[in-house]
Amino acid sequence: MEKEKLIEEINRLKEERNAIIMAHNYQLPEIQDIADFLGDSLELARKAVNIDADVIVFAGVDFMAETAKILNPEKTVLLPTPRATCAMANMLTIKHIIEAKKKYPDAPVVLYVNSSAEAKAYADVTVTSANAAKIVGKLDSDVVIFGPDKNLAHYVAKVTGKKVIPVPPNGHCYVHRKFTLEDVERARKLYPNAKLMVHPECEPEVQEQADIIVSTGGMIKRACEHDEWVVFTEREMVCRLQKLYPSKKFYPAREDATCIGMKAITLNHIYESLRDMKYRVEVPAEIAEKARKAIERMLEMS
């Protein structure tokens, strides 16, 4: 089916099913273009609270679709393909959390939303890269257990001055781990007038070279501050920024900074998922109830 016809059919099915499409900033441009809501993890979580639709098609990775389902237990949530997974979320196990709690029984468990629903059920609060430092700073504890991203944990510790225990010790995003000091040096040489916007999932040594350290939502908000930027996150963010700020220049720090899970979703997947109402996201009620408390606490605190 041709692209124009595919989009036409998706829109027809959306109306027929009373569906909306939520998409993350890392999605392919053609999916960003058809999304009803587009944003980072925090923005999408906020949007998911009061959705006026019967069906949510989530163009993101699995943990994001799970979060939408947890916040909307009565609605149908579709993940267009089961291949849209997050490797980092799968690095954190329940065993990691239980072992950390044995060592630090009084420390609250703070989990990045990039985690499974089962893990979130053990959390005191969830966070996103946009609000992690703010929320940890508000907690009445000088020690927190934080997972699964060790680099975001480093950033939070630096901003808050608190002791942040990463679980697992080497949890990371393989896309952001690609960025190195060599990329920083190359960016400075190629684009001497540009500033560097760096995602806090990047390695600490790369964060230290940043002009600003921000989530993808923060990148959108702060891009107005300068005319040229080198973007240290998933490459599709450059497309999003360029559309929002056509008069400014944005350069990907690496052309190969690609999230396989995010790119697993195509227009055809969205069409087939809506047509057949397949790949429904389900979260067991007991897990969802516990995880919902941690997510709702995040939304209240941010």
Swiss-Prot record:
<feature type="binding site">
    <location>
        <position position="24"/>
    </location>
    <ligand>
        <name>iminosuccinate</name>
    </ligand>
</feature>
<dbReference type="InterPro" id="IPR023066">
    <property type="entry name" value="Quinolinate_synth_type2"/>
</dbReference>
<dbReference type="GO" id="GO:0046872">
    <property type="term" value="F:metal ion binding"/>
</dbReference>
<feature type="binding site">
    <location>
        <position position="86"/>
    </location>
    <ligand>
        <name>[4Fe-4S] cluster</name>
    </ligand>
</feature>
<dbReference type="GO" id="GO:0008987">
    <property type="term" value="F:quinolinate synthetase A activity"/>
</dbReference>
<dbReference type="Pfam" id="PF02445">
    <property type="entry name" value="NadA"/>
</dbReference>
<feature type="binding site">
    <location>
        <position position="259"/>
    </location>
    <ligand>
        <name>[4Fe-4S] cluster</name>
    </ligand>
</feature>
<dbReference type="GO" id="GO:0051539">
    <property type="term" value="F:4 iron, 4 sulfur cluster binding"/>
</dbReference>
<feature type="binding site">
    <location>
        <position position="41"/>
    </location>
    <ligand>
        <name>iminosuccinate</name>
    </ligand>
</feature>
<dbReference type="InterPro" id="IPR036094">
    <property type="entry name" value="NadA_sf"/>
</dbReference>
<comment type="pathway">
    <text>Cofactor biosynthesis; NAD(+) biosynthesis; quinolinate from iminoaspartate: step 1/1.</text>
</comment>
<feature type="binding site">
    <location>
        <position position="129"/>
    </location>
    <ligand>
        <name>iminosuccinate</name>
    </ligand>
</feature>
<feature type="binding site">
    <location>
        <begin position="112"/>
        <end position="114"/>
    </location>
    <ligand>
        <name>iminosuccinate</name>
    </ligand>
</feature>
<feature type="binding site">
    <location>
        <position position="173"/>
    </location>
    <ligand>
        <name>[4Fe-4S] cluster</name>
    </ligand>
</feature>
<keyword id="KW-0411">Iron-sulfur</keyword>
<keyword id="KW-0963">Cytoplasm</keyword>
<keyword id="KW-0004">4Fe-4S</keyword>
<comment type="function">
    <text>Catalyzes the condensation of iminoaspartate with dihydroxyacetone phosphate to form quinolinate.</text>
</comment>
<dbReference type="GO" id="GO:0005737">
    <property type="term" value="C:cytoplasm"/>
</dbReference>
<feature type="binding site">
    <location>
        <position position="216"/>
    </location>
    <ligand>
        <name>iminosuccinate</name>
    </ligand>
</feature>
<protein>
    <recommendedName>
        <fullName>Quinolinate synthase</fullName>
        <ecNumber>2.5.1.72</ecNumber>
    </recommendedName>
</protein>
<comment type="similarity">
    <text>Belongs to the quinolinate synthase family. Type 2 subfamily.</text>
</comment>
<dbReference type="GO" id="GO:0034628">
    <property type="term" value="P:'de novo' NAD biosynthetic process from L-aspartate"/>
</dbReference>
<keyword id="KW-0808">Transferase</keyword>
<keyword id="KW-0479">Metal-binding</keyword>
<feature type="binding site">
    <location>
        <begin position="199"/>
        <end position="201"/>
    </location>
    <ligand>
        <name>iminosuccinate</name>
    </ligand>
</feature>
<dbReference type="InterPro" id="IPR003473">
    <property type="entry name" value="NadA"/>
</dbReference>
<keyword id="KW-0408">Iron</keyword>
<keyword id="KW-0662">Pyridine nucleotide biosynthesis</keyword>
